[in-house]
């Protein structure tokens, strides 16, 4: 029987770093963000759906999605956020299910990194859920530094996600990412050894 572990957190919580450590330990990880980027690539299913919905102003000079512009258009308007979620989630869910079913054929244990795992009701897909947790202030600082956001813009982005403190009750394991990389890696390696 295959064991599937869902990995979640919030924006700038450190999920990518955790995913990297898990992969380096020999486990397969389906990364929802990478799946979305492929679907949003020129000619992809999401690319087509977004282009039909918002028109060519979401494209850059090369005909690719202008992600910052797209993000601004979606986050600036609550109706756009709802439409975007409805439009994108079914396409993303379908692709993630396909990749999950493929890995079930070859892996005893694998992970799926899904930022909105709880919000988009993926919980039943998993035997365990690992939450990458970081304090809100640290999350804000990382988001501002990583994306060059003002504090106001970073707070706006966080306000559109379920707080990490609320996600704790869904987690089988909480990975505390408030410390340094060595401490983070030790936590993950300990958890992987218990599998």
Swiss-Prot record:
UniProt source species: Streptococcus agalactiae serotype V (strain ATCC BAA-611 / 2603 V/R)
Keyword Nucleotide-binding assigned: yes
Pfam family of the protein (one): CoaE
Keywords: ATP-binding, Coenzyme A biosynthesis, Cytoplasm, Kinase, Nucleotide-binding, Transferase
Purpose: Catalyzes the phosphorylation of the 3'-hydroxyl group of dephosphocoenzyme A to form coenzyme A.
Organism ancestry: Bacteria, Bacillati, Bacillota, Bacilli, Lactobacillales
Domain DPCK residue range list: 4-195
GO cellular component: a single term: cytoplasm
Name this polypeptide is given: Dephospho-CoA kinase
Keyword Transferase attributed: yes
Annotated InterPro entries: Depp_CoAkinase (IPR001977), P-loop_NTPase (IPR027417)
GO biological process annotation, one example: coenzyme A biosynthetic process
Annotated family: Belongs to the CoaE family.
Residues reported in the UniProt entry to bind ATP: 12-17
Gene designation per UniProt: coaE
Signal sequence interval, chain numbering: none
Record localization: Cytoplasm
Recorded metabolic or biological pathway in which this protein acts: Cofactor biosynthesis; coenzyme A biosynthesis; CoA from (R)-pantothenate: step 5/5
């Amino acid at each position: 029987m295959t064991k599937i572990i869902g990995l979640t957190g919030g924006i700038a919580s450190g999920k990518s770093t955790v995913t990297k450590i898990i992969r380096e330990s020999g486990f397969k990880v389906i990364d929802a963000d990478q799946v979305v980027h492929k679907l949003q690539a020129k000619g992809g299913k999401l690319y087509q759906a977004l282009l039909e919905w918002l028109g060519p102003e979401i494209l850059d000079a090369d005909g690719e999605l202008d992600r910052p512009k797209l993000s601004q258009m979606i986050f600036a308007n609550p109706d756009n956020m709802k439409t975007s979620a409805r439009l994108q989630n079914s396409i993303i869910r379908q692709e993630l299910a396909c990749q999950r079913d493929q890995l079930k054929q070859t892996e005893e244990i694998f992970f799926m990194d899904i930022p909105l795992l709880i919000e988009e009701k993926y919980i039943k897909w998993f035997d365990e859920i690992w939450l990458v947790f970081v304090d809100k202030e640290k999350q804000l600082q990382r988001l501002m530094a990583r994306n060059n956001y003002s504090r106001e813009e970073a707070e706006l982005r966080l306000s559109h996600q379920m707080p990490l403190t609320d996600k704790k009750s869904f987690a089988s394991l909480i990975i505390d990412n408030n410390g340094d990389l060595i401490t983070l890696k030790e936590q993950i390696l300990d958890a992987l050894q218990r599998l």
